[in-house]
Amino acid sequence: MFMNCRRVKKWHFLQLLSMCCVMSVLMVCWEHVDHHVVSHVKSYSYRYLINSYDFINKSLSVSPEEAARFGSFPYLLDRRDVCKNKDVLLLLFVKSSPGNFKRRQAIRSTWGNESYISQELGVVVKVVFAMGVRPDRSGHKTMQRELRKEHMAHHDLIQQDFLDTFHNLTVKLLLQFRWTHENCAHAHFLMSADDDVFIHVPNLVHYLQELKSQNVRNLWVGHVHRGAPPVRKRDSKYYMPFDMYQWSSYPDYTAGAGYVVSGDVAAKIYQATQSLNASMYIDDVFMGICAIAAGVSPQEHVYFSGEGKTPYHPCIYEKMITSHGHEGDIRYLWKAATGPQVEGISSGLLGKLYCAAVKMTLLCKPYFTNTYSCMAAFT
């Protein structure tokens, strides 16, 4: 009896000690916890209103003349006949910057190689690079001369006369949808991707061919962010002033690193941009605002990555669509992801069990990775 009482007292003491430790950590880190947890809980509870009603669009609506001011920059480099007289399955816009020549070359020789896509996959995919002008005006003339040479060699640069900076990403989005509307409106699908994104084009083409055969409409697919709160810290790259966006939650949107819309959605988004305030410089969020106006909701695809780089493994390559953060290894990954070692790796019962175990190990982490979710391990 005496021993039992001692055990009970010891257990209560340990509980009290643990609670004190937890409370101490919370008190020290409360500001951090409040920002990253409480704000997310608060914004997620608010997202239903944002996604269900149009008051957000009314607050950001502008006249057609005002909207045109954001997307009326003159073209410096262009090629209007890219899609002419072609049955284009996919128009793929790569968001690049003037100085990223090596990235563009890597893309042209791997997943963006139109000849490979036509010969090996039997479809027409047109790849073009969207950009503004170099912010540093001191080297502007030299850079433009190099870009003209590049364009003469490859005929795939779409450049407008705006400063190519983070705060002009929405202007680059407007460029993409305007150019599509004017020059490639008949494309079945439109994709927007960063120039440090790896795209497994064979997997993407097979996926889109299946959707095309089903005559899918109202498609906007990618890695979906739901209930994300605006960042109010001034020192953040993603800082959002209250006077620009006063709501507690952003509308649902896909990660701007890579997403796909069907042709009808591309047309609707373009129309939405004609009456919305594009000074919202976070292009992913602006896309979500346009989608509300267009009556379109984003769809999650577990093999579109967020901001993170996906694990390297044949079991991942077999179904991957995009992976983000590849500045110098695109050629290596292309060779690895499309090589013979990937084909049939999950065939048969043992193959399925093996790849399921591998993907669970690589993807099901107890912390946030911003790449494929754990759900991808079970598909």
Swiss-Prot record:
InterPro entries: Glyco_trans_31. It is found in: Golgi apparatus membrane. Residues 1-12 are cytoplasmic. Belongs to the glycosyltransferase 31 family. GO terms for cellular component: Golgi membrane. It is a single-pass type II membrane protein. It catalyses: a beta-D-Gal-(1->4)-beta-D-Glc-(1<->1)-Cer(d18:1(4E)) + UDP-N-acetyl-alpha-D-glucosamine = a beta-D-GlcNAc-(1->3)-beta-D-Gal-(1->4)-beta-D-Glc-(1<->1)-Cer(d18:1(4E)) + UDP + H(+); a neolactoside nLc4Cer(d18:1(4E)) + UDP-N-acetyl-alpha-D-glucosamine = a neolactoside IV(3)-beta-GlcNAc-nLc4Cer(d18:1(4E)) + UDP + H(+). It is an enzyme of class 2 (transferase). This is Lactosylceramide 1,3-N-acetyl-beta-D-glucosaminyltransferase A. Induction: Hedgehog signaling is required for expression in embryonic lens. Disulfide bonds: none annotated. Glycans are attached at N57, N113, N168, N277. Keywords: Glycoprotein, Glycosyltransferase, Golgi apparatus, Lipid metabolism, Membrane, Signal-anchor, Transferase, Transmembrane, Transmembrane helix. One of its GO terms (molecular function) is lactosylceramide 1,3-N-acetyl-beta-D-glucosaminyltransferase activity. Its EC number is 2.4.1.206. Pathway: Protein modification; protein glycosylation. One of its GO terms (biological process) is protein O-linked glycosylation.
